[in-house]
UniProtKB/Swiss-Prot annotation:
HAMAP family: Ribosomal_uL14. The keyword Plastid applies. It is found in: Plastid. The lineage of its organism: Eukaryota, Viridiplantae, Streptophyta, Embryophyta, Marchantiophyta. One of its GO terms (cellular component) is plastid. Part of the 50S ribosomal subunit. Belongs to the universal ribosomal protein uL14 family. GO terms for molecular function: large ribosomal subunit rRNA binding; structural constituent of ribosome. The gene is rpl14. This is Large ribosomal subunit protein uL14c. InterPro entries: Ribosomal_uL14 (IPR000218), Ribosomal_uL14_bac-type (IPR005745), Ribosomal_uL14_sf (IPR036853). It comes from the Eukaryota.
Length: 122
């Protein structure tokens, strides 16, 4: 569960390292974002000499959360960290690589390009 002011890692090579959520996109009354939801975030830490700079406002899709997620088959999955992948206006990833495992729920949210870049889909 990601809400405003939540810090998360970045799971791609766009240059950002840490994000802080400032808005959960969707309807006005959404408080939390889960896996596959799009957020608006600010870059808190960035790698020098990369396109994404510190204090830049970016859109990102949630790839991993520490909050457990129940699946329809009864299994539960949870990750060690909160992580997001930065995206552009067309919902394509800004980076060319994705790091770490990605939840299968992104496939249902039409983020197939992120799924194809991921080394492992759980």
């Amino acid at each position: 569960m990601i809400q405003p002011q939540t810090h998360s890692n970045v799971a791609d090579n766009s240059g950002a390292q840490k994000l802080m959520c400032i808005r959960v996109t969707g309807t006005n009354d959404r408080e939390y974002a889960g896996i596959g939801d799009v957020i608006v975030a600010v870059v808190k830490e960035a790698v020098p000499n990369m396109p994404t700079k510190k204090s830049e406002i970016v859109r990102a899709v949630i790839a991993r959360t520490r909050k457990e997620i129940g699946r329809t088959d009864g299994s539960v999955i949870k990750f060690d960290d909160n992580a997001a992948v930065t995206i552009n206006r067309e919902n394509n990833p800004r980076g060319t690589r994705v790091f770490g495992p990605i939840a299968r729920e992104l496939r249902g949210s039409n983020f197939t390009k992120i799924i194809s870049l991921a080394p492992e889909v759980l």
